Amino acid sequence: MYLVSIYFDEKTTSRIQGYITQVAKRRGNPFMIEKNVPPHLTISAFETRSEDQVISLFEETRDMFQSGEIIWCSVGAFFPNVLYLSPVLNTYLQELSEKVYKELLKIADVKVHKCYRPMQWVPHATIGKKLSKEEMLAAFQVLQEQFGVFSSRVVRIGFAKTNPYEELWKKVM
C-alpha cells in the first residue's frame, strides 16, 4: 500500500501529536506512538508495482503542489476502533484530492482505494487506532475535554509506502 499525505506547520503538528499522546496515555494504547505515525492527512491510498513511475510523476508535477489552509472543526470515528480529527472539506483539499487522483490514473497499474477517490473520501487525521470499546470512550473523553476548532497550514506533501513506513518522495511548500 502506498500513500500520498500532507503534513502541517509545527504548531499544528505539536497540537495533534499532543492529542495522540494524551489518548495513548489515558488508556495505555500506544499504537500510534510505537509506530511513529506523524500527524498527517492522507490524500490518496493506492496499490501499484510501479513505484519508480510514481516518484517520477510527482517529481515532474511538483509545481502543482502548493501550501494551503485547513480548518479542523470536528472529531469523528471509523467504527469500531479509529478516532480522528476532521477538517472542513474546503476547495484546497478537494482540488488536491482531484489533482493527485488525476495524476495517479496516468500510471496503468495504479489502483486507488475506493475510500480515497474524489467525492468518496473522508479527510481526517487519525488520533487513535486499534482502540477497544473502552479505549474509544476514553479517547472521546480526552478530545471532549481538550479539542477546539483551529486552523493549520499545510507545509509538506509526501509519497510513502507502508509496512514498514518509508517516505519515497516529498515536497516542502
Where do the language-model regions lie?
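Basic, often amphipathic N-terminal segments
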Residues: M1-E69, Y92-S151, E167-M173
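Short hydrophobic/aromatic beta-strand or adjacent loop that forms the aromatic wall/cage
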Residues: L3, V82, R156
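A structural detector for beta-sheet-dominated domains
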Residues: Y7-D9, C73, V88, V155, ...
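Histidine- and/or cysteine-centered catalytic micro-motif in compact active-site loops
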Residues: F46, V75, V88-N90
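Glycine-rich beta-strand-turn "strand-cap" elements at beta-sheet edges
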Residues: V75-F78, V154-L168
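Acidic/polar active-site rim loop that often engages polyanionic ligands
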Residues: F78-N81, M119-W121
